[in-house]
Amino acid sequence: MKRLLCLLLLTTLTGCGSFLIQNPNLQENEVTSATTNVDAVEGDKEEDTGIIDTLRGRSEPISGDPAWAPIHPKEKPEHYAAATGSLFNVDHAQDMYDDTKPRGLGDIVTVMLAENTKAAKSADAELSKKNDSSMDPLQVGGQELQVGGQYNFSYELSNDNKFTGNTSANQSNSLSGSITVEVIEVLSNGNLLIRGEKWLTLNTGDEYIRLSGTIRPDDIAFDNTIASTRISNARIQYSGTGDQQDMQEPGFLARFFNVAL
């Protein structure tokens, strides 16, 4: 029996030791975990660690976030030509029938925000159930059958259940304004991925607008604007930071008890 226990203990220690020893053949890129992608609006989307992140609250965005840095397209090599003395420059020439709509990486376009959504929902429920049951006293030979001279064989039951419930929800959102964004990618079908942000510094904090999505060049108007309703997979965020925003969020204890419930 002792030999068996010693053998099991030795096997366990050997397995733990082999688990702690890293394989020298592993490459560094195989050991390092992949970085998380950056969301188009919210910023870093790391996995939550549980109640700690819930109590900590939502992380505030910052101005100058690298995920929202402007795109700088690569410079095109200059075309060196012999000086002819003419004021005409081929590099800066534009076709008479060509438009100036954004079509390339780094081009800018103004988005006209015109969001207006309304939602209403109501539901009513009513349930009722009623049961009645009775039996007359039993008679034998014309006489009422009794037990002990006091109780007869009769009963009467009645049951009435009712349930009534109703609920209603109303929500409306409206957002108007404008924000200028830039093209960060040109898809193979010609559609453009856009992204941009605008920060406004106020007395007690900052307000910001962030927008991202996919647009068609054909939907861009002649004045280089496009309606927000023409954006596919639109992500629009309008919020703020600072004291005014902090006062609108529940405190530490309120978040704690909400999690507990």
Curated annotation (Swiss-Prot):
Lipidation sites (N-palmitoyl cysteine): C16
Main location: membrane
Signal peptide residue numbers: 1-15
GO biological process: bacterial-type flagellum-dependent cell motility
Membrane topology: Lipid-anchor
Keywords: Bacterial flagellum, Cell outer membrane, Lipoprotein, Membrane, Palmitate, Signal
Protein family: Belongs to the FlgH family.
Role played: Assembles around the rod to form the L-ring and probably protects the motor/basal body from shearing forces during rotation.
UniProt protein name: Flagellar L-ring protein
Organism, as annotated: Aliivibrio salmonicida (strain LFI1238)
Chain's gene name: flgH
